[in-house]
C-alpha cells in the first residue's frame, strides 16, 4: 500500500511539470488539427498534413503514457538512458514536419480565400483551412518549445525528461 501514494505523487509530479503540460498541449492541439481536417472534405497535399498530424499525435500519446507510467525503460533501443535524447529527436522531427504542414495549410487557405465572400453560396473550405493553419502553427510552436527544453536538459547533462 505505501507505493500507491508515491505513484500518485509521481503522476501528479509529471502532470504538473513543464514536459507534462507541454505533452498534454501537443496531444490536444494535434487532435484539434487532425479532427478539423478529417471532419471536412480534403484533397491533395492535405493528405500529408493529416498523416503528420495523426502520426505525431499517436507518437506523442505513446510517449506521454510511457513517461506518465514511468515505463520508458521497457522501450527497446530508445528507452532507458536514451529517453531524453529520444524525446528531443521526436520533438525536433515533429517541429520540422509541422513547419511543412504550416506551409501547406497557408497555401491552401490562400487558394480558397476567394470563397470567403458573403455572396458565395457554395461549400467553402476557407474557414476550415484557416482553423487548421492556426492549429498547425500552435502545435509546431509547442513542439519547438518542448525540443528547446529537452535540448537544454541534455546540454546540462541530465538524463531524465522530468
UniProtKB/Swiss-Prot annotation:
Entry keyword set: Membrane, Nucleus, Transmembrane, Transmembrane helix
Residue ranges of every copy of the MARVEL domain listed in the record: 14-155
A Pfam family annotated for this UniProt entry: MARVEL
Any one biological process term the GO annotation gives: myelination
UniProt xrefs under InterPro entries: MAL, Marvel, MARVEL-CKLF_proteins
Cytoplasmic membrane side: 1-17, 69-86, 149-162
PROSITE patterns noted in UniProt: MARVEL
Subcellular location: Membrane; Nucleus
Transmembrane segment boundaries: 18-38, 48-68, 87-107, 128-148
Membrane topology: Multi-pass membrane protein
Gene Ontology terms: cellular component: membrane; nucleus
GO MF term (any one): structural constituent of myelin sheath
Extracellular side: 39-47, 108-127
Official protein name in the record: MARVEL domain-containing protein 1
Organism lineage: Eukaryota, Metazoa, Chordata, Craniata, Vertebrata
Amino acid at each position: 500500500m505505501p507505493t500507491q501514494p508515491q505513484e500518485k505523487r509521481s503522476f501528479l509530479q509529471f502532470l504538473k511539470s513543464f514536459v507534462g503540460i507541454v505533452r498534454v498541449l501537443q496531444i490536444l492541439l494535434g487532435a484539434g488539427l487532425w479532427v478539423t481536417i478529417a471532419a471536412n472534405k480534403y484533397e491533395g497535399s492535405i493528405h500529408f498534413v493529416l498523416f503528420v498530424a495523426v502520426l505525431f499525435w499517436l507518437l506523442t500519446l505513446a510517449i506521454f503514457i510511457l513517461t506518465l507510467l514511468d515505463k520508458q525503460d521497457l522501450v527497446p533501443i530508445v528507452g532507458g538512458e536514451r529517453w531524453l535524447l529520444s524525446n528531443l529527436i521526436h520533438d525536433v522531427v515533429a517541429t520540422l514536419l509541422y513547419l511543412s504542414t504550416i506551409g501547406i495549410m497557408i497555401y491552401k487557405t490562400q487558394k480558397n480565400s476567394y470563397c470567403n465572400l458573403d455572396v458565395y453560396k457554395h461549400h467553402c473550405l476557407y474557414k476550415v483551412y484557416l482553423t487548421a493553419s492556426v492549429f498547425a502553427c500552435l502545435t509546431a510552436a509547442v513542439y519547438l518549445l518542448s525540443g528547446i527544453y529537452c535540448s537544454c536538459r541534455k546540454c546540462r547533462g541530465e538524463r531524465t525528461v522530468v
